[in-house]
Design a protein with these regions (language model features):
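Key DNA-contacting residues within the recognition helix of helix-turn-helix
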Residues: 14, 40-41, 69
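DNA major-groove recognition helix of helix-turn-helix/homeodomain DNA-binding modules
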Residues: 52-67
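Residue-level signal for the short linker/turn that defines the boundary of a DNA-recognition helix
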Residues: 11, 22-23, 49-52
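Short alpha-helical DNA-recognition segment
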Residues: 22-41
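Alpha-helical residues within the helix-turn-helix
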Residues: 18-19, 30, 59
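A short, Lys/Arg-rich alpha-helix, primarily the initiator
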Residues: 1-21
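Short, charged recognition helix plus adjacent turn
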Residues: 2, 59, 69-83
Length: 83
């Protein structure tokens, strides 16, 4: 049995949707070419989108990719030492 682990990548999609005239998950899904269930899974951190989908999401909101998705800096947890 496969165990689904939450991704370490966080995102601000829900906040961006509400800042964009309360765009629904279904509306976002249609604009980026995925299902509503996929948008839900991405928002909840249960699924990491492909690079193409990530860029489409950023484009929909007119923001840089880094505004939508954040990846924790491992160095901050290891005392600032790069890996």
């Amino acid at each position: 049995m496969t165990v689904v682990r939450p991704t370490r990548i966080t995102n601000g999609i829900r906040a961006l949707r509400f800042a964009s005239a309360e765009m629904t998950q279904a509306e976002l899904a249609e604009r980026i070419g995925v299902t509503r269930q996929t948008v839900i899974a991405i928002e909840q951190g249960r699924y990491s989108p492909s690079l193409e989908v990530a860029f489409k999401i950023a484009r929909v909101f007119g923001v840089p990719l880094e505004t939508v998705f954040q990846y924790p800096d491992d160095r901050s947890r290891r005392g600032g030492k790069p890996s």
